[in-house]
């Protein structure tokens, strides 16, 4: 009997949950209605509280009413100073004064309208001034483009570009003494008699290996063996690979001297003299590289002694090493490169101005022409 009662107690209700027991019972219909009513009441109360809070916030913010500008905005008129009026003999009519009893009506000015509510006074003034300037510029532009007959000028960018640059004419002249002149642009070869080292400024010397004739190629003006003296005014700078030599004067074997003042060139006429360039790389960076290596060694040692008592001394030496490396690099980084050119190398002189030998040489008949002249005489 007891077993039957226990089995009946543990039987599963067919319409209930599979895991239901005596401690879990289904809700009746009235209980479901009560639970639904409670949930609905809580939802309505939350909605009501939220709407009330929003209403309080709306009431707390002050409402500012800004008068709308119903009239169209018109910029302030530009005051143009009137021309000096002619003297009028007629009596100016008197303007009737308004009666005192009636107060004057206050017409709002443009700057007092609500459109200027959030603009400062300076901004309004500058805006009116800029509008006035723009109007004047447009009027001036219209006046410039207009002709007396009301026609529009045809000047535009294309017509301006079509006007060529007018240059002064160059008049041709004849050389006064072409037989005795070496004209500008002549390239004279020369053999160096002194080696070149650009560490210091100084003088150089070269000798002409051949005769240099005049423009007509009839008379030798600079004989073979003429010595030319030049000067190196300064050395090279970083990145330079050529040295500038200024040739001052030439002296012929017959002791005729002439001032050249012409620059140097290579065999092909390129400016400057090439040579072997020493950039002094190791002199510039060897000290800094050595100090950097020593500093790196001490930095590696400081990592092993990081927590020991000697860590402070390693850091102090490292900081001093960085300053020493920077000082050494500044002292040697600006060493200029040096160009060296050997004695006996061929250089050129680019004649920069006409050389006139008329006051030095004279022409005379020689050989058969002179004998024929004597027989005729």
Swiss-Prot record:
Sequence intervals crossing the membrane: 33-50
Chief localisation class: membrane
Source species: Agrobacterium tumefaciens (strain 15955)
Family named by the database record: Belongs to the TrbI/VirB10 family.
Function as written in the Swiss-Prot or TrEMBL entry: VirB proteins are suggested to act at the bacterial surface and there play an important role in directing T-DNA transfer to plant cells.
Region (Disordered): 92-161
Keywords, comma-separated and alphabetical: Cell inner membrane, Cell membrane, Crown gall tumor, Membrane, Plasmid, Transmembrane, Transmembrane helix
Organism ancestry: Bacteria, Pseudomonadati, Pseudomonadota, Alphaproteobacteria, Hyphomicrobiales
Alphabetical list of NCBIfam families matching this protein: PRK13855.1, T4SS_VirB10
Membrane topology qualifier: Single-pass membrane protein
Keyword Transmembrane helix: yes
Domain of life: Bacteria
Xref: CDD domains: VirB10
Basic and acidic residues biased stretches: 101-112, 134-145
Protein name (database record): Protein virB10
UniProt cross-references to InterPro entries, sorted A to Z: T4SS_VirB10/PtlG (IPR047695), T4SS_VirB10/TraB/TrbI (IPR005498), T4SS_VirB10/TrbI (IPR042217)
Cell location: Cell inner membrane
GO cellular component: plasma membrane
